[in-house]
């Protein structure tokens, strides 16, 4: 390799490292150009990430999916679905902070909510819907009366923070489990689209 080529390659590589972090945000490109839909999620261990991708599949892939930790710019999207993993009846702090900071911009765009919660392996009841949506996400966004769904989640010890894992393992007979179902997430995506007709 000649010095000139080496120098050019080195400059390009250095330039690539200086690109803004947002350019590498977790964005799933839809099957159509100019997507009008976005899903914004907050997750601790990845369950809500998977639920978001599966919801987008149920919406025929016309959705871009964003992790709130990437601090995405959602201004170009017409419709937004918001959701996240739940611990002690709340979503991750990053999602709460984002929704609070962008409440005015998002309120009229939100078209659905979802929550992923292990719920101690118990069936979901109206109590969870009231706690997660009416008492939490709706208060953060101001958007109410929208399609909402609570999905049972999963526990993977290796993905949990040590203190949370220790607390969860202190419950009798608590073991790893996975109750998140792709078919339920996809059906909810279809429900959101149907509500727009």
Set out the residue ranges of the language-model regions.
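N-terminal export signals
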Residues: 4-26
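FMN-binding flavodoxin-like domain, especially the glycine-rich phosphate-binding loop
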Residues: 25-35, 50, 57-62, 89-197
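A short, well-structured beta->alpha microelement
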Residues: 61-72
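A short, aliphatic-rich alpha-helical micro-motif
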Residues: 74-75, 106
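Structural motif
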Residues: 78-79
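Short glycine-/small-residue-rich Rossmann-like dinucleotide-binding loops
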Residues: 85-86
């Amino acid at each position: 390799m000649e010095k000139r080529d080496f120098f050019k390659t080195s400059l390009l590589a250095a330039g690539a490292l200086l690109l803004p972090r947002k350019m590498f945000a977790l964005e799933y490109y839809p099957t159509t150009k100019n997507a009008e839909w976005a899903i914004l999620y907050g997750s601790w261990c990845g369950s809500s990430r998977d639920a978001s991708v599966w919801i987008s599949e149920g919406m025929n892939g016309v959705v871009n999916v964003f992790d709130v930790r990437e601090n995405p710019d959602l201004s170009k999207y017409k419709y937004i679905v918001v959701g996240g993993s739940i611990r002690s009846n709340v979503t991750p702090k990053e999602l709460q902070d984002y929704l609070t900071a962008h409440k005015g911009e998002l309120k009229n765009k939100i078209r659905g909510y979802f929550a992923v919660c292990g719920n101690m392996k118990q069936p979901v009841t109206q109590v969870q819907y009231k706690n997660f949506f009416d008492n939490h996400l709706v208060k953060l966004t101001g958007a109410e009366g929208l399609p909402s769904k609570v999905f049972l989640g999963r526990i993977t010890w290796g993905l949990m923070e040590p203190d949370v894992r220790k607390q969860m393992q202190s419950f009798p007979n608590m073991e790893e489990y996975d109750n998140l179902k792709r078919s339920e997430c996809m059906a909810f995506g279809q429900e959101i689209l149907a509500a727009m007709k």
